[in-house]
């Protein structure tokens, strides 16, 4: 069976195989690569979590790209970078010339806007989307749709939307807002306002968080990586609290060159729930983010 559109948790891949006797082979592609760019083959190793190897006559290159869309250098093995495509399966360009700006670092190399890494054997591993798309159940959501709706509220100064891990849909949109100075409004009111002003139902934020100040870069742009970390942390906290009500966890979200994001869990008060270690894999099986338990006993 083939699968695409969004990353699938390893636990779901394994469960499907156990129940049906059939393997799911994850692949990757887009309209610009005539649907398919990589796949798992019937021969050789099938690496669960990767999207396979390039198809014949297709080249995939991982590179560091500057803000103007130019190649800085090629990434090392297992180093995360922009996924570039070339070959007979790659389209020659968009009809609207403005859409071609910054997506062709070289004449024959198309920048997909996705981020990933190639391992030693040429398997591709997706780790993120450079353009911040939120994928909810295979449905691509432009965060700008969510942000524009919230920004239309008279008491909202600025809004930013990111994807939060979700056990059912893979990701769901959540929003962070900074209010106009002196304004008072509840998070539920903002969530209702957004829902009523977004025509695309899937883009309505499931949660809205009011922040004193949103994180920004040195040039004043909203720094979404920090907001994603907050969203991931909240999702893990919710799952852990539901499963281990008597155990207190500290979560540390770290950047990882190979994995993208790594979630470090530290149990600081088990209060009799010493068996939580054996239960963690089941509780967190739907998360695609890599996580590790910090052993504080040694």
What are these regions (language model features)?
Residues 7, 32, 183, 215-216:
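Conserved nucleotide-binding/hydrolysis micro-motifs of P-loop NTPases
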Residues 82, 157-158, 207:
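Residues at the N-termini of beta-strands
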Residues 199-210, 246-247, 283-298:
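Conserved short beta-strand edge segments in small beta-sheet-based binding/regulatory domains
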Residues 1-4, 8-27, 31-124, 131-133, ...:
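Conserved AMP-binding/adenylate-forming
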Residues 87, 92-93, 101, 107, ...:
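AMP-binding/adenylate-forming catalytic core of the ANL superfamily
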């Amino acid at each position: 069976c083939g699968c695409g559109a969004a990353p699938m948790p390893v636990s779901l891949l394994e469960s499907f195989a156990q129940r049906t006797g059939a393997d799911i082979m994850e692949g990757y592609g887009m309209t610009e690569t005539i649907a398919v760019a990589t796949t798992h083959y019937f021969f050789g190793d099938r690496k669960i979590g990767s999207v396979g190897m390039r198809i014949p006559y297709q080249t995939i290159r991982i590179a560091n790209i500057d803000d103007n869309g130019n190649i800085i250098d090629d990434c090392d093995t297992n180093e995360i970078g922009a996924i570039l495509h070339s070959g007979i399966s790659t389209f020659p360009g968009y009809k609207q010339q403005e859409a071609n700006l910054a997506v062709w670092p070289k004449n024959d190399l198309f920048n997909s806007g996705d981020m990933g890494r190639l391992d030693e054997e040429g398997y591709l591993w997706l780790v993120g989307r450079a353009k911040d798309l939120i994928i909810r159940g295979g449905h691509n959501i432009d965060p700008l749709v969510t942000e524009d709706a919230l920004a239309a509220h008279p008491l909202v100064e600025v809004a930013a939307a990111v994807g939060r891990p979700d056990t059912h849909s893979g990701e769901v949109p959540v929003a962070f807002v900074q209010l106009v100075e002196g304004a008072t409004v509840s998070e539920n009111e903002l969530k209702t306002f957004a829902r009523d002003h977004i025509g695309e139902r899937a883009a309505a934020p499931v949660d809205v968080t009011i922040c004193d100040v949103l994180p920004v870069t040195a040039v004043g742009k909203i720094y979404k990586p920090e907001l994603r970390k907050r969203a991931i942390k909240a999702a893990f906290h919710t799952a852990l609290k539901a499963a281990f009500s008597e155990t207190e966890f500290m979560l540390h979200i770290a950047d990882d060159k190979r994995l993208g994001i790594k979630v470090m869990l530290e149990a600081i008060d088990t209060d009799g729930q010493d068996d939580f270690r054996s239960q963690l894999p089941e509780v967190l099986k739907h998360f695609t983010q890599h996580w590790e338990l910090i052993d504080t006993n040694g």
